Amino acid sequence: AEKAVNAYNTLKDWGMQMLVGTVTSNPCTAVVEKTHEDNMFQLTPSGSAVESIKYDNAFRVCFSDPGQGTASAKYIGENKLASKVAVIYNSSDVYSSGIYAKFAEEAANQNFEIVSAEAFTADNKTDFSVQLSKAQGADADLVFLPIYYNEASLILAQAKAMGYAPKFFGCDGLDGILGVENFDASLAEGVMLLTPFAADAQDDATKNFVSAYEAAYGDTPNQFAADAYDAVYVVKEAIEKSGATPADGVSGICDKLKGVMTEITYDGLTGSAMSWAADGTVNKAPKAMEIKNGEYSLIQ
């Protein structure tokens, strides 16, 4: 978070007038304090914590943590994916704990039971044998992982080593697991996740973006890349709608942009007819994906 604030101050010194960023929740929550002080417009592509956009100058492209938790519980319940669910989450991370809290709340309305909920922390995120043993001992047929892909890759490997093979289900933080260095991608076969972007979608916008991204970077884009791409064009839409110009200055631009964010709609890679509430949250539908044959596949 400190590095993010330092980077913000550097960019401000260079003449930045609005901010697309930051990428994740903890840095975003720190930086939004600064953009609020400066009345600078901020649009985070993928900072999902509630606190990341707690001021009226800040908006986001991605789902909120509570939204992901609620949507995941509904999807698992409505599609009858499991009767007994275990959760492994990071209690030291606002992204993970925020999703888990709302998941547990919505689970009470669904036809499955949370039989195990075990936390880890940033200081202890390499050995998951205790959490997995408790899930296995409780006969969980699905393990919900509201965490990022690095830790998830370790969990999948350790589950395989102990002969535990439940369905694994995560959120947008799992998008990118196939690219983890030295990870056996076959371990992720059948993993499901709710995420706003599917690189194998067949609409022209997605196909064009994926081919251009692969040509530029030699890799398939994930939802972080797609959220950031959409963020740039959302800002463009807001600028055009508001008539803001560089001459308005940082505060003037911010006032104009936040005034129109609740009026614009945008068709992007991560959602159609996206719209924004005054609290900065986006309205769009999540997409369910499953990893098949080493690729992310959209569940139709």
Indicate residue ranges for each PLM-predicted region.
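Extracytosolic ligand-binding ectodomains
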Residues: 1-300
